[in-house]
Amino acid sequence: MAMEVGYLRHSTTITNGLCCNCDPKPRGARRVQTRLPGTLCLVKDTFTSSKAKLKKPSQREIFLTSRKRLNQIQAVSTAEKEREADKTSTPPIPSSIHDISNGDHILGFGADLTEDHPGYHDLEYKRRRSRIADLAKIHKIGEPIPCVDYTSEEIRVWGHVLDTLVDLYPTHACKEYLNCYELFNFKPNYIPQLQELSEVLERSTGWHIRPVAGLLHPRDFLNGLAFRTFHSTQYVRHGSNPMYTPEPDICHEVLGHVPILADPEFADLAWAIGQASLGASEKDIWHLTKLYWYTVEFGTVKEGNEIKAFGAGLLSSFGELKHMRVGTDGFMPEFVELDPFKKMPKMSYKDGYQKRYFLCESFADAAAKLRAYSRSILKPEVQSIKFGDTPIRL
């Protein structure tokens, strides 16, 4: 029989075909070396006797370790090939919102919190998150969004965030946001249900809200925008630090994203990013994710001689809003004109406030630029999509 017992890096000293750290070959065996791709050499022992066995512990250890390492190398090689193929391959292209899952590619939700999360040590909070996430996972498109019976603690957190931010909006938020904000009549003692908000958006811009259990895969989330659907979480951030959340929660979604989606020109801007994502390569999805980050999340717009915020990451963060206008500890962020065709900088979200904001002349101008970029990467096979039973040509 033939048995693979070792692998050698070519930098290792070889004496008479053996690694200097290996035991000599068993009597009756002949040594064969087979070169593998890359910098590895596979060593095989071919036994002429069926009774020959690995008698020494060191030999068996070499066999097990080497076999495991070889499997790891082969797995890495396969993964690298798959990643290279993904960069150019075209994934299945959704033709309607029904083709997009809101639960198969969740990057984090429920009780799966990292150690640096404020609620990591709060078992009851994690259970609560998990129960709310389950409501989103059972939701069917076309059915009313399940209501969440928010607790007094969750309402307290919501009210604190709302009362803190509302004082900054008149001077820091763009006029489109302020106009749309009035449509929702937010109150500090009541957390609005997603179904109520979705109905307002449907009447104003034709957009819908779909509940989601947690952070969606970027492709799924961006694909949803192409069907004028915004995926929103329903859970509330941990009460120990009401002005901070490491991931999207209902305060961020409702105060940051929802109002501005009632503005037709902004809705077109978000829609353009979504259209570009249909059938996009992994490389293009990564670029679109950055475009989304620097517009929908942290975008700014000229308003006369001032710069105002329209991104949800700004509008749901008291500290970020102030930083945008006056800087922090003597550091002033820079403002760069939005150009979707240029390489976007690394996204920053765990090392303090943004160092750079992208600036739009107007929502209409930004939407036009994003549509031009969308047309440049849109796959030929992406001809139209469906809103309900109505096909829309792209």
Curated annotation (Swiss-Prot):
Annotated GO MF terms: iron ion binding; phenylalanine 4-monooxygenase activity
Gene Ontology CC, one term: chloroplast
Keyword Cell membrane: no
Principal location listed in the UniProt entry: plastid
Cleaved signal peptide residues: none
Transit peptide: 1-79
Catalysis: reaction(s): (6R)-L-erythro-5,6,7,8-tetrahydrobiopterin + L-phenylalanine + O2 = (4aS,6R)-4a-hydroxy-L-erythro-5,6,7,8-tetrahydrobiopterin + L-tyrosine
InterPro entries: ArAA_hydroxylase, ArAA_hydroxylase_Fe/CU_BS, ArAA_hydroxylase_sf, Aro-AA_hydroxylase_C_sf, Aromatic-AA_hydroxylase_C
Protein name (database record): Phenylalanine 4-monooxygenase, chloroplastic
Organism: Physcomitrium patens (Spreading-leaved earth moss)
